[in-house]
Amino acid sequence: MKICRLEDLYTKITILVKNRIIMISRRSFLSKAAAATVATALTPYVFSRGCIKKNNSPLEGKKVLFVWGGWMGHEPDKCRDIFVPWMESEGAKVTVSETLDAYLKMDKKQLDLIIQIWTMGQITGDQENALLDAISDGVGIAGWHGGLGDSFRNNVAYQFMVGGQWVAHPGGVIDYRVNIVDHDDPITMGLSDFDMHSEQYFMHVDPNVKVLATTTFSDEHADWIGGNVIPVVWKKAYGKGRVFYSSLGHVSADFNVPEALEIQKRGIRWASLSKYEPMEDWKQPVYADWGKRG
């Protein structure tokens, strides 16, 4: 990936420096005072012909199927235009499809990653079986918000794969905070808690997903859920396949929040490595001790 514009470089390092003492402005971020911070932020990059080039992207050479459609209120076309060019800039070979029949036509042996943004709608039995079979055999999948977590409400096998299902967003578009709860995982490492102005997804979630970020609900819009903590970002396994999900991204403008965009990019990279890295081993039996509580 090349970053040849000053503005792009500024965006890339914003997350890494925003919570430090040295705050880099657009006019001063090349100053001597900021040099040490910039050097640290750019450690993964090398200079080439006046540009910044990221080394060894996990997406280099990966074959990606990007399937979009469903309810257009989630702006799948605008989100497509954010992520497809980015993946291609990282060296991925991306096939874009506006039909779920793409799952019937894909060659799972030649595919590394599926990205789906398809809110609501219906999927046929053959389409669903082809999708789940590919992931179970090692094709990764990544997505966000309703495009993955509220796709096919009647298909419980699909929801079993995702690891969760949207059920409510009390208050609609509101201000809320996202809390990073795993600071060691590469997807969230180096990130701090951040604020969103969007839909706060209340979800029913598989207890064995690896939770990376959460949000806490108030009692303003539904008093019985006040204080409830719900996962926002998780990763999981489905057979041999990696599954990454973030509930952020109600509309494309949500990805103007640097942390929301960075989390999604990192999750996509992680999911693309299903066939190339061993599956992580974790178990989080969150209900195991319930019967033992006094």
What are the language-model segments listed below?
Residues K2, S28-R49:
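N-terminal export signals
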Residues L59-K62, S89, H221-I230, A237-G294:
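Extracellular ligand-binding/catalytic regions of CAZymes and related secreted enzymes
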